[in-house]
Amino acid sequence: MANKVIIIGATSGIGLELAKLYIKNGDMVGVTGRRNELLLKLQLQFPAQVVTECFDVRGNENILHLESLIKKLGGLDILIYNSGVGDISKELDWQLDKQTTQTNVNGFIEIVNYTFNYFAKQGHG
């Protein structure tokens, strides 16, 4: 039976390669990222298995986007949070550090907390 997988941050690198592995395994894959053209490129390659949702985890509508993707997939079995940034802040520039915190901490906590509760309610995941 095919899993329903969401990968947060799947437009390049590890996230994209994980998406391809799950697709090869026959799973349904929801991919997210900030670069819509890269999301659509993957969806065009595998239209029967890939759904997309373009958003930045630093935004205020993470849960709305996640719920939309879960609806498109018809459920959720696996979530992979692969979004992260790491810029050098030589002068301890708060604006730069704020972006890192919003992505690596706030976005992670919001999405993983929602997903944990979703899995607990459905009894698996």
Language-model segments: what does each one mean?
Residues 75-76, 119-125:
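Active-site loop of short-chain dehydrogenase/reductase
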Residues 82-88:
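Conserved NAD(P)H cofactor-binding loop of Rossmann-fold oxidoreductase domains
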Residues 11-12:
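Conserved glycine-rich cofactor-binding loop
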Residues 90-102:
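Short alpha-helical oligomerization interface
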Residues 80, 111-115:
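Hydrophobic positions on the long internal alpha-helix
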Residues 46-61:
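Rossmann-fold cofactor-recognition segment
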Residues 25-40:
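Conserved glycine-rich Rossmann-like NAD(P)H-binding loop of the short-chain dehydrogenase/reductase
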